[in-house]
Each structure stands twice: as C-alpha cells, then as structure tokens.
C-alpha cells in the first residue's frame, strides 16, 4: 500500500460493516466474489471480516487473504476487539495475505465506558497501547480505532492516540459510530488531532462514519480538507442502521472535484492526477454485484449508481443533454462503467456470443455456472424476442449467485381467481434427498405458496418484506422478486427472477430459507456479538 500524503487511501468495509446490514448475510463464496470485485475496483484495503466472530467469519477472512491478498493485490484487514483472543484470531486468519493489517478497537466515549465497557479512562488508556503492541507481534500494519470518537472528550482522545502510536499503530481511525457529528464538527475534530497529538505524523489519519443524519460523505470530505488520508466506506453505502459512507460517492466527489481538493493534499490545483487508486469504470459493476449478493436494492435516485442517476425526464433537461451532455451532467456515465452499447441477443445467439457478452458485462463464470446460465438463457429466448443486458444480469444472478441449495423447489402450481380460494401445491426436495409435496390456501397465490412451503420446511420465520420489480419493459419482462425473513432477531434475504412472478416468488422464498437453514447449521458456540465502530 502506498502511504503518500498526496492521495487518499480507500479502505473498504463492505464485507465487515456492510454485512451487518439487516438481511445482508453472505456465505463464503459470495464474500470471495465481492473481495475479488473490490480488488478489480482498486481499493487499497479490504476489511474482510471479524475473524473471532465465528468459524465461518474466520474461514472467509482466511480464504480472502489467500486468494485475493496476493503480492499485487490489496491489503487484507481483519477486525479485532482490544483483547488477545480477538487479535490472535485475526492474526492467524490473515497469515496467507502478502500484505495484512489488524484493526483493533476499544470505546473511548464516556457513555460507552460507563454503560458498555464498565471501565475507567485509566483502564482504557492502559489496554489500548498494550493490545496494539500485541497486534504488532502478528503484523507490522496495525490500525487502532477509538470507538465513538465523535462523542469522546477531545483531550482524552489525544492522549489515547498518542499512546497507541507510540505502541506501534500505523493508522489511527476516527469513527463517528452513531452518525452524530456535522461536517464542521468532524473537520474540527480531525484538525484538533493533527494539532494536538505530538506524534501524529507517524500515523495515517483515517475516518469511519455512519449515515444516521445523512452526513457521512460530507463529513469525510471535510475530514480530507483537515488531514484525513484514509476513508473507510462501503459499496452502495450499506451498513448498520442508515449505513456507512458510500465508496462510490466519495470517490466520484474526489474525482469530479479534484481541482477543489488538490490544494488540501499539497497538489497544484490544476493537477489531473487521480486522488485515489480506484478504477472508476468498475464502480457500477461492483455496485450491482453487491446489491445482487446482499439482496439490498439500490434506490432509484441513489447518487452515482441509482437507476435515475443519469436519467432526464424534464423536456428542458433532455434538450440540453442531447445538445451537450455537460449542460446537465457533471460526469460521464461511462466513467463509472455504464455504457449505451446495449447488444440485443435472441434465440439464435450462440454460446460464444453469450459468453462474450457476459465477459463484457463483468461476469467471469466457471464452465458449470456458464452452462447453467446458458440453458436458462435459451429457455428465456423461447419466451422473449429480445434479451437485453438487464435480462442477462438477472439470469446470471438467479442461476449463480444463490446460497447453497439445501431445499430445492421441484414444482409449484397455483389456482386462483376473483371467485376462487387461492390454492398452491408445491414439491420440495429436502437436504436429506426426500421429495415432499404439500398444499395450502392463502389470501393470494403468493401467500398460499409460502404457507405450503412452510408446511414442508418447518423452520419458523416471519416474512417482513416482499417486493417485485420488472427488470425490463414489456409484457414479457423478467420479474425480479426480493424478500426478507426474520428468525430469532436475524434477517435473511432471498431473490429470484423469472418471467412468471409466481415462480420467482416461490424461488425467492426458498433462497431466503436456504440462507436461514445454512445459518442454523453453523457452529455458533464462539460467536460474540457483532462488533460496531
């Protein structure tokens, strides 16, 4: 990792803090797919998880360290509370990476000290440097975070930062854990650290923030102006509660407005050199991948990657854009990887054309996954005259980006109408290989299907969200269904796509149940509460 003071280090925590979004549970293969996409995107550091949280988290971090943390790849980071057990777990999980980092933390705000840790300032001032020094026995790259720094006493914050830097911390991260600060306050906090921590020049100042007041990105940009050189963010801004600072928004703000930010990094104002290492043309593909795998849809008006981000409905705006895009667009859609080159495939398109177009869209499938997706494509081509890139994305997502198929839907039939009681019959293959058939009635066809499935699966759950949207226009469009289930306080998402939304609804429900069932099978004996910064 390049630690030059004239550029911004991008630290991605999609796989750690982002996965703490309700319903965003990922399996090992999905985490690896996202990590590979983040490496292609060009992030400097990937926080791959919290190794002590569970055996599954440990294995995922270790696998990412081995397969993505190569000599030319990003630094792989693991989170650890300021305890020897956590730090040892992180150190062991990160061993395979060429470049690794342990990120350890402890709370410093008075409210956290009193009610969560039940420790004094003196206790924490002793623990933090001791644990940083212990982390240094595993790696030379150690990051320390004073949790809830935004509400901590500045003088105590200066003390603890000086102590951990003396103990060997190479990065000190300042989290606005509850999204409480405003840009002016957060900028002043970073400025105060720069001016009052005597050894601050020996460490990189990082920032981490939550979006509870919608100010995370603005806070980060103000922090950059005051000396922050690492930004901790997530794809699509996913994360606990209202989420984290969005990587794509930060990167494009620094890209589009670099002439404004250049002087704050000691550069000539007119320098065209990028302020980050991000390959912006990978942004859109990475956004879609994360959305697909987590089941967290991107709102249409989301900055940079939303469906409407480059759409113009006003006649005046449309006229201006047609004459010159700069009239109403401050950035080129192609700069984030969007393209107007929509190649239409049909039933006469062959396997090679299919593979080629998927590669152009950023999908690198194994032969087995390609075979499954191609068969699905040919089936769809018999129903639709033209298949667009959006259709292809839905096919790949539905066929290859699913949890382990513990329960498999073999058959679904429904009977309904305005003068009939909705009835559903389903056949499911269980994890033990048995085929079980059952039926149920409901308030509608989807309700009947879900009741019939529950009679077979018998895993208690609560359906808390059901949504369906058209992938493309037209009466023959693919319908994409996303659902969320709650079980014992945890949320599991599922998705599926089909030209028949009843079938898609059934498959989405099975997808979510498979995630839930897989989670129940995991050994959670060593699963501490999920950490939060």
Swiss-Prot record:
InterPro entries reported for this sequence: 2-IPM_HCS-like, 2-isopropylmalate_synth_dimer, AIPM/Hcit_synth_CS, Aldolase_TIM, LeuA/HCS_post-cat, LeuA_allosteric_dom_sf, LeuA_bact_synth, PYR_CT
Gene3D superfamilies the record matches: 1.10.238.260, 3.30.160.270, Aldolase class I
GO BP, sorted A to Z: L-leucine biosynthetic process
Catalysed reaction, written as an equation: 3-methyl-2-oxobutanoate + acetyl-CoA + H2O = (2S)-2-isopropylmalate + CoA + H(+)
Keyword DNA repair attached: no
Binding, Mn(2+): 17, 208, 210, 244
This protein's record includes keyword Amino-acid biosynthesis: yes
GO-annotated cellular components: cytoplasm
Molecular-function annotations in GO: 2-isopropylmalate synthase activity; acetyl-CoA C-acetyltransferase activity; manganese ion binding
Span list, region Regulatory domain: 408-533
Subcellular location: Cytoplasm
Metabolic or biological pathway, per its Swiss-Prot or TrEMBL entry: Amino-acid biosynthesis; L-leucine biosynthesis; L-leucine from 3-methyl-2-oxobutanoate: step 1/4
All copies of domain Pyruvate carboxyltransferase, residue ranges: 8-269
NCBIfam families: leuA_bact (TIGR00973), PRK00915.1-3 (NF002086)
Reported function: Catalyzes the condensation of the acetyl group of acetyl-CoA with 3-methyl-2-oxobutanoate (2-ketoisovalerate) to form 3-carboxy-3-hydroxy-4-methylpentanoate (2-isopropylmalate).
UniProt name for this protein: 2-isopropylmalate synthase
């Amino acid at each position: 990792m390049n630690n030059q003071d004239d550029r911004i280090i991008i630290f991605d925590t999609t796989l750690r803090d982002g996965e703490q979004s309700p319903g965003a549970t990922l399996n090992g293969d999905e985490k690896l797919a996202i990590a590979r996409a983040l490496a292609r995107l060009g992030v400097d550091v990937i926080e791959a998880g919290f190794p002590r949280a569970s055996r599954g988290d440990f294995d995922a971090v270790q696998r990412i360290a081995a397969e993505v943390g190569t000599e030319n790849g990003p630094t792989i980071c693991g989170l650890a509370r300021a305890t020897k057990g956590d730090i040892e777990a992180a150190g062991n999980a990160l061993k395979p990476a060429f470049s690794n980092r342990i990120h350890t933390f402890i709370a410093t705000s008075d409210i956290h000290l009193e009610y969560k840790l039940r420790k004094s300032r003196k206790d924490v001032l002793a623990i933090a440097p001791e644990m940083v020094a212990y982390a240094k026995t595993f790696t030379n790259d150690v990051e320390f975070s004073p949790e809830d720094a935004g509400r901590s006493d500045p003088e105590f914050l200066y003390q603890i930062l000086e102590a951990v830097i003396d103990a060997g911390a190479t990065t000190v991260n300042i989290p606005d854990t509850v999204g409480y600060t405003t840009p002016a306050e957060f900028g002043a906090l970073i400025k105060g650290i720069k001016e009052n921590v005597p050894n601050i020049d020996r460490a990189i100042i990082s920032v981490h923030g939550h979006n509870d007041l919608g100010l995370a990105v603005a806070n980060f940009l103000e922090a950059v102006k005051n000396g922050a050189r690492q930004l901790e963010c997530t794809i699509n801004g996913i994360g606990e509660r209202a989420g984290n600072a969005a990587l794509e928004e930060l990167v494009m703000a620094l890209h589009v407005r670099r002439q404004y930010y250049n002087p704050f990094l000691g550069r000539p104002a007119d320098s065209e050199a990028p302020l980050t290492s991000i390959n912006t043309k990978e942004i859109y593909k990475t956004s879609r991948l994360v959305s697909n795998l987590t089941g967290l849809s991107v709102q249409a008006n989301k900055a940079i990657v939303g469906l409407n981000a480059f759409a113009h409905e006003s006649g005046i705006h449309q006229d201006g854009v047609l004459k010159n895009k700069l009239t109403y667009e401050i950035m080129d859609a192609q700069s984030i990887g969007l393209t107007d080159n929509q190649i239409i495939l049909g039933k006469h398109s062959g396997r090679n054309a299919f593979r080629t177009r998927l590669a152009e869209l950023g999908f690198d499938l194994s032969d087995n996954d390609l075979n499954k997706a191609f068969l699905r494509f040919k089936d769809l081509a018999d129903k639709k005259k033209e298949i667009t890139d959006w259709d292809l994305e839905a096919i790949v997502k539905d066929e290859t980006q699913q949890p382990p198929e513990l329960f498999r839907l073999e058959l679904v039939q429904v009977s309904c109408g305005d003068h009939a009681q909705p009835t559903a019959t389903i056949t499911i293959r269980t994890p033990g290989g048995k085929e079980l058939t059952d039926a149920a009635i409901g308030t509608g066809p989807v309700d009947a299907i879900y009741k019939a499935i529950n009679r077979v699966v018998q895993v208690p759950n609560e359906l808390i969200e059901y949504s369906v949207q058209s992938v493309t226009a037209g009466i023959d469009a693919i319908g994409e269904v996303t659902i969320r289930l709650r079980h014992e306080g945890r949320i599991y998402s599922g998705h599926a796509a089909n030209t028949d939304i009843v079938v898609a609804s059934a498959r989405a429900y099975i997808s979510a149940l498979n995630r839930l069932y897989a989670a129940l099978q995991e050994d959670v004996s060593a699963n501490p509460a999920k950490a939060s910064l």
